[in-house]
Design a protein with these regions (language model features):
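C-terminal non-catalytic interaction/assembly regions of soluble proteins
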Residues: 237, 241-296, 300-306, 310-314
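Conserved beta-strand termini and adjacent loop/short-helix elements that scaffold enzyme active sites
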Residues: 30-33, 116-118, 264-266, 307
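Extended alpha-helical regions
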Residues: 303-334
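Donor nucleotide-activated moiety binding/catalytic core segment of transferases
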Residues: 41
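Conserved mixed alpha/beta catalytic, RNA-binding, or beta-rich assembly cores of soluble enzyme
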Residues: 12-18, 25, 34-36, 44-99, ...
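Polybasic, low-complexity association/targeting segments
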Residues: 6-11
Length: 334
């Protein structure tokens, strides 16, 4: 986690420097070196994973207020008094990791962590915190409150997952008899009214004609996601045949999504075990009967999720890496 610390006094600066030994990050003091509260906050809110104010909570609240957008994207914000007595997460307690950070900082300086999120205060399962620990994206953040609200009301919430989850479900959580009955679900292809948690384990296999533009690939990818219900946030990498390694459109498409892209030879793709959609035409052009499916499986080291999908001269497939979710996500439970 990339932290940024801001202090307001010499005493606060000393504490910030101490804390940065535990949770590394930049340390600044307001009023020194041209640092202003508004300027520092604007810069770090966009760049850092966590903002740590060593000073009054009111100052921190007023500083971050103009920048708050969404619990899905806002950084963690924690405030400590300059004496190191209390550590209070103010923003993104679960998804941003502010609760965990406050506890770590408190342990480093002997402070009391002041955790105010309702599930934590009541000792209940926090679905968004668990999702973060499992490397899952929350697909519909407004639905978090329905799961948490049910638990707070003493109800049992049901989950569905195609992957086995290690450990014992927390109190108030049980497996749904049918996936359609789940209150929250682990899936790459969200459908229905549940809260969907998307594992970031997907690899996109790509096949395309020479000269295919990034815009064409983007349009085809949008159609692929729509027609298969694939959540694009679950894709973290792309793969293709080495004949495409210098295709500007493909490289730009992957770069725009922040995906690393790997390229394999026809021989490497032919060696991938499994049953794939075969094409004589593709075999004649590339030396292997299928590019997108084989490339996705090879790069993922896992299994095929979505078979070949063709759209305007582009083919896509999706595979998933091995995934092992665990109910024992807290450090003291592992």
């Amino acid at each position: 986690m990339n932290c940024a610390y801001l202090a307001f006094t010499a005493k606060g600066l000393a504490l910030a420097q101490q804390l940065a030994q535990t949770c590394p990050g930049s340390v600044s003091r307001c009023g020194l070196g041209g640092v202003t509260l508004a300027g520092w906050t604007a810069q770090q809110f966009a760049a850092a994973d966590a903002l740590v104010f060593v000073g009054a909570a009111g100052i921190a609240v007023r500083a971050i207020a103009p920048h708050c957008q969404s619990k899905a994207t806002d950084p963690a914000v924690v405030v400590l008094d300059e004496c190191g007595r209390f550590a209070v997460p103010l923003l993104s307690g679960h998804l941003g990791g502010a609760n965990d950070l406050a506890c770590r900082l408190a342990a480093a300086c002997g402070a009391v962590p002041v955790i105010t999120t309702a599930t934590d205060a009541n000792g209940l399962f926090a679905v968004d915190e668990w999702a973060k620990k499992q490397n899952c994206a929350v697909w519909e953040t407004p639905r978090i409150k329905f799961v948490s609200g049910a638990l707070l009301a003493g109800k049992t919430v049901r989950y569905a997952s195609p992957w086995a989850i290690a450990g014992t479900p927390p109190a108030g959580v049980a497996e749904a008899e049918e996936p359609s009955d789940a209150d929250f679900a682990l899936t790459m292809t969200p459908q229905g009214n549940a809260l969907h948690l998307i594992p970031r384990i997907g690899v996109l296999g790509v096949g395309c004609k020479r000269g295919t533009t990034a815009a064409q690939l983007e349009a085809a990818f949008a159609a692929f996601c729509t027609d298969t219900n694939l959540a694009p946030v679950g894709i973290t990498a792309a793969a293709s045949i080495d004949l495409k390694q210098n295709e500007p459109g493909l490289l730009e498409f992957c770069r725009s999504h922040g995906w690393p892209v790997s390229f394999s030879s026809a021989a490497q793709l032919r060696a991938v075990p499994g049953t794939f959609s075969a094409s004589r035409f593709v075999q004649g052009v590339t030396g292997v009967d299928n590019v997108c499916e084989r490339a996705a499986v090879l790069a993922s080291g896992g299994t095929l999720l979505l078979p070949k999908y063709a759209h305007t001269g582009v083919t896509f497939a999706a595979a998933v890496r091995p995934f092992a979710p665990d109910w024992r996500w807290k450090t003291d439970e592992a």
